[in-house]
UniProtKB/Swiss-Prot annotation:
InterPro entries: ATP_synth_B-like_membr_sf, ATP_synth_b/b'su_bac/chlpt. Keywords: ATP synthesis, CF(0), Hydrogen ion transport, Ion transport, Membrane, Thylakoid, Transmembrane, Transmembrane helix, Transport. This is ATP synthase subunit b. One of its GO terms (cellular component) is plasma membrane-derived thylakoid membrane. It is a single-pass membrane protein. The chain crosses the membrane at residues 26-48.
Length: 171
């Protein structure tokens, strides 16, 4: 019943602070908290120590990865610079080779043009010589044809015999 009275009294008085140590269980709470601190210190210490060791190991691992990554980056940058230098050198060589090949092609084309001109001139000269030879043969054939015609008209049988005899005598 006394708890009913206290409850009724607490309701009527409003909010208040109970300073009775035995009723508020402060001693029990202090003992429990003390035991938790004493007993939990080792457990909590181990837990925090393990967590700290794990974090330190992760930090060391990350620092090692950072160092190896920085080294790999440095090597990659060096290789990039070397590759760029090699590409520039190859470009210069390619341009020089292209210029040399271009000049070689131009020289060969000029030589081919000169050779074609010489061949064409020789072909023209040969054709001219052939035409002249043909014209000479034609002229000789025409002249012989006229001579035969004239000889047959002007020479009779006796004149032909005298001509043959004279030709034989000169031989």
């Amino acid at each position: 019943m006394s708890s009913w009275i206290l409850l009724a009294h607490a309701e009527t008085s409003g909010f208040g602070l109970n300073l009775d140590l035995f009723e508020t269980n402060l001693i029990n709470l202090a003992i429990i908290i003390g035991l938790l601190v004493y007993a939990g210190r080792g457990f909590l210490g181990n837990l925090l120590s393990n967590r700290r060791a794990a974090i330190e190991a992760e930090i060391r691992e990350v620092e090692e990865k950072l160092a190896s990554s920085a080294q790999a980056l440095s090597q990659a940058q060096t290789q990039l610079k070397e590759a760029e230098a090699e590409a520039a050198r190859l470009l210069v060589e390619a341009k020089a080779r292209a210029a040399a090949v271009r000049q070689e092609i131009l020289d060969k084309a000029a030589a081919d043009v000169e050779r074609l001109k010489a061949t064409a001139a020789q072909d023209v000269s040969t054709e001219q010589q052939r035409v002249l030879d043909e014209l000479r043969r034609y002229a000789v054939a025409q002249a012989l044809s006229r001579v035969e015609t004239q000889l047959s008209q002007q020479l009779d049988e006796a004149a032909q015999q005298r001509l043959i005899d004279r030709s034989l005598a000169t031989l």
